Amino acid sequence: MIKNLLNKRKYITVSSVELNDTELSEDEKPNIPSGMWSKCEKCAKILYTEDLRENFNVCPNCGHHFKLGAYERIKYLTDENTFVEFDKKMIGRNPLDFNGYEEKIKGYQKKSHVIEGVVTGEAYIAQRKVVLCVMDSNFMMGSMGTAVGEKITRAIEYATKNRLPLIIFTCSGGARMQEGIYSLMQMAKVSGAIYRHGRENLLYITVLTNPTTGGVTASFAMEGDIILSEPGCLVGFAGRRVIEGTINEKLPDDFQTAEFLLEKGFIDKIVQRKDLKQVITSLLRMHEVDYE
């Protein structure tokens, strides 16, 4: 008996290879709902998606700002149930008969749950009425085509007519190549509407989000009276490799970041997403004018 007590207990060993090769049946597989967990693109930490949403879609570990859909951003920013959307059914056409373009638009509409690359409308922020344009990178990387340009222009004209402050959240890969020159002309059209809005001494705030590039950067993104940005945003016109290849020089590591632009005086302030509503409210209050 004593001998048995002193003997080491023996275990049946199973190799990890055998375990890894074993196929679990459907009943044995863990039932984890799709979308329950998210992985941070910067620090690779696995995050509970509900906690991430409660933290404004910002990683609590490293502060990385996840991409936000247009309607999510509007929900975070505006007073509850005050947003009224403009031109809800306006979608892009295919002016150049670009092969497969209509199918691509339909695919992105299904995938992103928006019908175009921008959502526009009016809402209240801290009980102050504003006009909002929020670009959505989930739809063709927020590229600017005729529908995007037209929706933004109409929203600006509405703000001008009703003497309202204008806030545009930019997020774009630039002009939409499938629409060619029709896409490029939106830069001038939107900029003209911005000019007329400014001529009436009305406030225009831009908020740069990741990424803001190409024709959007070269036009209305950098025309705001006040230019804010979320941390770590890519902001530029041409791509890094294109510039380095053209000038045959190595660019700084922080080139085309919001922090670099702040240092050089191109933007006014970098704001954490959780603080955006408070900062914008303060700006609206400072520039408040009674026109009656």
Curated annotation (Swiss-Prot):
Cofactor requirements of the protein: Zn(2+)
Cofactor binding comment, as recorded: Binds 1 zinc ion per subunit.
UniProt-listed InterPro entries: AcCoA_carboxyl_beta, Acetyl_CoA_COase_Trfase_b_su, ClpP/crotonase-like_dom_sf, COA_CT_N, Znf-ACC
Domain of life: Bacteria
Zinc finger region(s), C4-type: 40-62
Chain sites annotated for binding Zn(2+): 40, 43, 59, 62
Gene Ontology annotations for the cellular component aspect, listed alphabetically: acetyl-CoA carboxylase complex
Domain CoA carboxyltransferase N-terminal: 36-292
EC annotation from Swiss-Prot or TrEMBL: 2.1.3.15
A molecular function GO annotation: acetyl-CoA carboxylase activity
Pfam families registered for this protein in UniProt: Carboxyl_trans, Zn_ribbon_ACC
Subcellular location: Cytoplasm
Enzymatic class: transferase
GO biological process: fatty acid biosynthetic process; malonyl-CoA biosynthetic process
Subunit note: Acetyl-CoA carboxylase is a heterohexamer composed of biotin carboxyl carrier protein (AccB), biotin carboxylase (AccC) and two subunits each of ACCase subunit alpha (AccA) and ACCase subunit beta (AccD).
Similarity comment: Belongs to the AccD/PCCB family.
Role, per record: Component of the acetyl coenzyme A carboxylase (ACC) complex. Biotin carboxylase (BC) catalyzes the carboxylation of biotin on its carrier protein (BCCP) and then the CO(2) group is transferred by the transcarboxylase to acetyl-CoA to form malonyl-CoA.
Name the UniProt record assigns to this protein: Acetyl-coenzyme A carboxylase carboxyl transferase subunit beta
Organism: Clostridium perfringens (strain 13 / Type A)
